[in-house]
Amino acid sequence: MAPINIEGNDFWMIACTVIIVFALVKFMFSKISFYQSANTTEWPAGPKTLPIIGNLHQLGGGVPLQVALANLAKVYGGAFTIWIGSWVPMIVISDIDNAREVLVNKSADYSARDVPDILKIITANGKNIADCDSGPFWHNLKKGLQSCINPSNVMSLSRLQEKDMQNLIKSMQERASQHNGIIKPLDHAKEASMRLLSRVIFGHDFSNEDLVIGVKDALDEMVRISGLASLADAFKIAKYLPSQRKNIRDMYATRDRVYNLIQPHIVPNLPANSFLYFLTSQDYSDEIIYSMVLEIFGLGVDSTAATAVWALSFLVGEQEIQEKLYREINNRTGGQRPVKVVDLKELPYLQAVMKETLRMKPIAPLAVPHVAAKDTTFKGRRIVKGTKVMVNLYAIHHDPNVFPAPYKFMPERFLKDVNSDGRFGDINTMESSLIPFGAGMRICGGVELAKQMVAFALASMVNEFKWDCVSEGKLPDLSEAISFILYMKNPLEAKITPRTKPFRQ
């Protein structure tokens, strides 16, 4: 038999036809299975779906996914069901009462995970704190991390953290002097986070410039790749497309680059206060050890740096708030010294600015989706094992019934002495509804360290510089983009002016 010769265009037409037919058949069978299970599962009502794409046609329009879902919640309520392209439905939670039911009241019931294929590459197939199901392995990992970032251990790092920050301030000033006072603070904030976390991971005295720069560059690449791979999350069959297969190859290559940077530092006699000491003392494979180190960098560096820059962006646009924050910091330091880590707990307005930033720009606005670990219930509805639940933190944090004027940046809403009469909303309700790091047993394990890192970076940068628009009247673009985390679509550029400091003269 003669070999079959298919021209390039014909091949792709046939391939696309096969994919579409396969997807239709798969979709129909999944819908049949879904509705058969509906006899024992009560799904919250949601928008109608279309074949193959599910509800994707209602999630576009040029708005971020968390905003589109929040808009649907205005129609379908605080809990509704959607299909995002694939063949598995998902419950979307959009108010604090329903969120507490899933995250707190039935925390163990909804403690499982479903890891996207692209992330399995860098998480040892979901064997890390954020992505593995709860159980002995997860509890042991979390316990080990907590032992390394407990308050006393973190405080013992403060002297080095303060020294690193002063070096960073000097670097920012030098950079600005070469560019007419204009700076992009994101990379500088990432560098500060990288240095502290490298000491948590490898030991307090650790210092290695090649690793800091190499891992930072690799993390940027991973964020880029994961954004390109989102198609395969919605349509599982899309992972066979050439573009998606390239994303997979690129992610493996980037992961291996990081592993090669980490491997030389796994040596005998590691410092007992390092996270790597804990990891190597367990019966973990090298892949799990590497993936855990990568997770701490991945979740800690970008999230803290992005949050600090979001806060700076608000302060550039709200000069009165920036000056009020500066006066508080200056009153604490007397204008005679840099900010110290111990100052942070004595700066209530700084904490309010932090809370308001995390409210308006939660770093993971859709959190990490939860999965029912067993058959359970939700507000009296039967939910079968394996059901996905997504908590829309953005919608919860922008609920006008909880946060009056939710789209206005108002740190005062979190100050008891200013908001004692409730004019900015009920402060107790707002505090309990602010869950940027999640809640319950799956709350972010490094939440306290993350808040300290952001607060210290923000306080130091405001103490040292006045932050202004690049040109008069041109406010920062607060448009959002999302990959692992929520970051600025157009990174902040600002003009900085060194504040007069006697200790620098």
From Swiss-Prot:
Induction (free text): Up-regulated by elicitor treatment.
Keyword line: Endoplasmic reticulum, Heme, Iron, Membrane, Metal-binding, Monooxygenase, Oxidoreductase, Transmembrane, Transmembrane helix
Subcellular location: Endoplasmic reticulum membrane
Binding site for heme: C444
Superkingdom per UniProt: Eukaryota
Gene Ontology CC: endoplasmic reticulum membrane
Thermal activity profile: Optimum temperature is 30 degrees Celsius.
Disruption phenotype: Accumulation of upstream metabolites, such as reticuline, but reduced production of morphine.
pH dependence (UniProt free text): Optimum pH is 8.5.
Transmembrane segments: 10-30
EC number(s) given by UniProt: 1.14.19.67
Top EC class of this enzyme: oxidoreductase
GO biological process, one term: morphine biosynthetic process
Catalysed reaction, written as an equation: (R)-reticuline + reduced [NADPH--hemoprotein reductase] + O2 = salutaridine + oxidized [NADPH--hemoprotein reductase] + 2 H2O + H(+)
Pfam families with a match to the protein in the record: p450
Obligatory cofactor(s): heme
Membrane topology: Single-pass membrane protein
InterPro entries given in the database record: Cyt_P450, Cyt_P450_E_grp-I, Cyt_P450_sf
One MF annotation (Gene Ontology) recorded for this entry: salutaridine synthase activity
Family: Belongs to the cytochrome P450 family.
Reported function: Cytochrome P450 monooxygenase involved in biosynthesis of morphinan-type benzylisoquinoline and opiate alkaloids natural products. Catalyzes the formation of the morphinan alkaloid salutaridine by intramolecular phenol oxidation of (R)-reticuline without the incorporation of oxygen into the product. Can also use (R)-norreticuline as substrate.
Official protein name in the record: Salutaridine synthase
Organism placement in taxonomy: Eukaryota, Viridiplantae, Streptophyta, Embryophyta, Tracheophyta
Gene: CYP719B1
